[in-house]
């Protein structure tokens, strides 16, 4: 699944590093000393999940079909023009980012509103004739949001293990 996601994203102009860059920018606002390699690792982890595989593949295919004018009726123009009140693309993004809870969804909202990096480039390119990234820009932003949340979780877990006064226990130990 990871390799297929990587392949279709690359075909649409998206690299793992470009997603990891957004992950880094998003999480470095809240966490000191995160590494880009941890961001790349988190993006790769997200891209290996079955649900994300389905979202990435579907998003890319819908955008491709819209570019080829394969939809009929008003939905063709709605998708191709990325109309503002069409929210299915954001709903898919919320679903992906929601894999990491409400913090993931909050991160997605921030990335979606303040578009930067590859998300901005996809959004801007989608306004050019013959190009549609209606779904892809949101899915890429959602992957970055989920990866950012994963980085926060991993980092906080590492910090907790460093604390000398913190004792781990399991409910099964009680």
Placement of each model-derived feature along the sequence:
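Glycine-rich, aromatic-bearing surface loops/beta-hairpins
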Residues: 108-174
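Long, charge-patterned amphipathic interaction tracts in eukaryotic proteins
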Residues: 40-116
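N-terminal interaction modules that seed assembly of large macromolecular complexes
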Residues: 2-66
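A near-ubiquitous, low-amplitude feature marking generic local secondary-structure context
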Residues: 2-6, 79-82, 122, 126, ...
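Intrinsic-disorder-associated interaction segments
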Residues: 12, 32, 36, 85, ...
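Phenylalanine-focused residue identity feature
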Residues: 2, 24, 53, 71, ...
């Amino acid at each position: 699944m990871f390799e297929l996601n990587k392949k279709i994203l690359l075909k649409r102009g998206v690299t793992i590093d470009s997603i990891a860059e957004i992950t880094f920018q998003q999480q470095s606002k809240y966490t000191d000393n995160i590494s880009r390699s941890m961001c790349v690792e988190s993006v790769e982890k997200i891209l290996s999940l079955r649900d994300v595989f389905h979202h990435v593949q579907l998003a890319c295919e819908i955008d491709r079909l819209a570019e080829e004018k394969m939809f009929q009726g008003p939905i063709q123009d709605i998708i191709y023009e990325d109309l503002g009140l069409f929210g299915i693309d954001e709903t898919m993004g919320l679903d992906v980012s929601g894999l990491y809870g409400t913090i993931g969804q909050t991160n997605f909202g921030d990335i979606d509103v303040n578009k930067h990096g590859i998300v901005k480039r996809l959004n801007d390119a989608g306004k050019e004739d013959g190009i549609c990234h209606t779904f892809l820009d949101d899915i890429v932003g959602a992957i970055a949001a989920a990866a950012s949340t994963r980085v926060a979780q991993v980092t906080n877990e590492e910090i907790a293990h460093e604390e000398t006064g913190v004792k781990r226990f399991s409910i099964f130990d009680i």
